[in-house]
Amino acid sequence: MEYVVVIPAAGQGKRMKAGKNKLFISLKGAPVIIHTLRVFESHAPCQKIILVINESEREDFRQLLAQFPIQTEIELVTGGAERQHSVYEGLKMIDKESVVLVHDGARPFVTHQHIDKLVETAEEAGAAVLAVPVKDTIKRAEGSRVAETFDRSSLWAVQTPQAFRLSLLKTAHMEAENKGFLGTDDASLVERLDGYQVSIVEGSYTNIKLTTPDDLIFAEAIMKAESGNHNV
């Protein structure tokens, strides 16, 4: 059940309109990235955290980790031009065959229970993603007009972490690089390989990614609810 997690943290998060890396935004007394790191710090099967960063922010991350120490081993790695390239740089730092998780730095509410199920599924199937059934009707548009309505019953909103056997994910990234393919997530790279399928593990609607200012309101509400549950 042991695993290594790669967390791409080099994005600027322009939709957050914070004027800085959104992972540095304070949430209930600590930066968003610290809340995310604490999830893995408190999960015994996590052997190492690879934090992929923008080189210009290396000192910022060092200072942050000095102020908010994390006991699990963390390696800071310089990322690439796109998220996909950053993840690949992180994967290069892992030598021992294992299950590797790829997780958004701005997704601090994933639970240990879901991580355990995800790792277990990846060990068996090779690749697995957390996802939740889509609640809303999804339509494809052309300009400002509806072009198609999809059957919602078969649609899932994919989250992170996503879990893979290390060798499989490395192969998928190498293949994507060789063919110049840029995917929307790591699972999409594996889906392109012959003979491999990605399993779905049902997650939670509270495992939100903090992308826009409104998400911070939802995050505070989730934290308040979690705090209330702990006090019961």
UniProtKB/Swiss-Prot annotation:
Site, as annotated: Transition state stabilizer: 15, 22
Metabolic or biological pathway: Isoprenoid biosynthesis; isopentenyl diphosphate biosynthesis via DXP pathway; isopentenyl diphosphate from 1-deoxy-D-xylulose 5-phosphate: step 2/6
Example GO molecular function: 2-C-methyl-D-erythritol 4-phosphate cytidylyltransferase activity
Superkingdom field: Bacteria
Keywords noted in UniProt: Isoprene biosynthesis, Nucleotidyltransferase, Transferase
Site (Positions MEP for the nucleophilic attack): residue numbering on this chain: 152, 209
UniProt-listed SUPFAM superfamilies: Nucleotide-diphospho-sugar transferases (SSF53448)
Catalysis: reaction(s): 2-C-methyl-D-erythritol 4-phosphate + CTP + H(+) = 4-CDP-2-C-methyl-D-erythritol + diphosphate
One GO term of the biological process aspect: isopentenyl diphosphate biosynthetic process, methylerythritol 4-phosphate pathway
PROSITE patterns: ISPD
One Pfam short name: IspD
EC code: 2.7.7.60
Enzyme kind, highest EC tier: transferase
Family label: Belongs to the IspD/TarI cytidylyltransferase family. IspD subfamily.
Listed PANTHER family: 2-C-METHYL-D-ERYTHRITOL 4-PHOSPHATE CYTIDYLYLTRANSFERASE, CHLOROPLASTIC
UniProt function note: Catalyzes the formation of 4-diphosphocytidyl-2-C-methyl-D-erythritol from CTP and 2-C-methyl-D-erythritol 4-phosphate (MEP).
Name of the protein described by the UniProt record: 2-C-methyl-D-erythritol 4-phosphate cytidylyltransferase
Organism per entry: Bacillus velezensis (strain DSM 23117 / BGSC 10A6 / LMG 26770 / FZB42) (Bacillus amyloliquefaciens subsp. plantarum)
